[in-house]
């Protein structure tokens, strides 16, 4: 919310102000993804970049046994960017309880907790998140295919 506050303090926050949030550990985001995020944030108020889940997703409430296996065709893997009308994002965030704020894992969860719609933007499998050493090797392989020197 600091970014929204900064924009407001600068006198630039309007009903049409769009904020695009992105993980710096996703260096392969494409122009198309960013462009579509801005478009759908303007049209729908909020959007999340996703790719269809290719693996079966299992839910476990206790960490030892499967409690649910959702239909794969309904499952997506979240990526970034995530984009929003800034004023609406701030408004919804302010309405969250401390308990709700404590379970936030990403900005779209703010909307989901308040049953607000979030449009899906098609991501890209190469928009990987570099978190573990293996991810860095994958990123290097992606770069290796596009190096010009």
Where are these regions (language model features)?
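Short, well-ordered alpha-helices that flank and scaffold nucleotide-derived cofactor binding pockets
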Residues: 5, 9, 39, 141-145
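Conserved strand-to-helix beginnings and helix N-cap segments that scaffold or border functional pockets
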Residues: 1, 31-32, 133
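Short, active-site-adjacent cap segments at secondary-structure transitions
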Residues: 26-28, 55-58, 127-129, 136-137
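Conserved core of the sugar-phosphate nucleotidyltransferase
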Residues: 15, 28-121
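Hydrophobic helical membrane-anchoring modules
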Residues: 127-149
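Short beta-strand-to-loop acidic/aromatic patch adjacent to the donor-nucleotide binding site
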Residues: 11-25
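Short phosphate-binding loop-to-helix
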Residues: 1-15
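Residue-level signal for inorganic ion chemistry
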Residues: 3, 23, 52, 85, ...
């Amino acid at each position: 919310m600091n970014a929204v506050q900064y924009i407001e303090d600068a006198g630039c926050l309007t009903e049409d102000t769009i904020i695009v949030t992105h993980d710096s550990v996703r260096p392969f985001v494409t122009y198309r993804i960013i462009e579509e995020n801005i478009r759908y944030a303007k049209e729908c108020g909020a959007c999340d970049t996703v790719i269809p889940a290719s693996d079966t997703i299992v839910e476990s409430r206790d960490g030892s046994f499967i409690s649910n296996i959702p239909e794969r065709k309904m499952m997506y893997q979240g990526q970034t960017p995530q984009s929003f009308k800034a004023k609406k994002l701030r408004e919804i965030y302010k309405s969250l309880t401390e308990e709700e704020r404590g379970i936030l894992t990403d900005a779209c969860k703010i909307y989901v907790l308040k049953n607000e719609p979030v449009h899906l933007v098609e991501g890209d499998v190469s928009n990987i998140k570099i978190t573990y050493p293996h991810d860095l090797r994958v990123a290097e392989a992606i770069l290796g295919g596009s190096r010009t020197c």
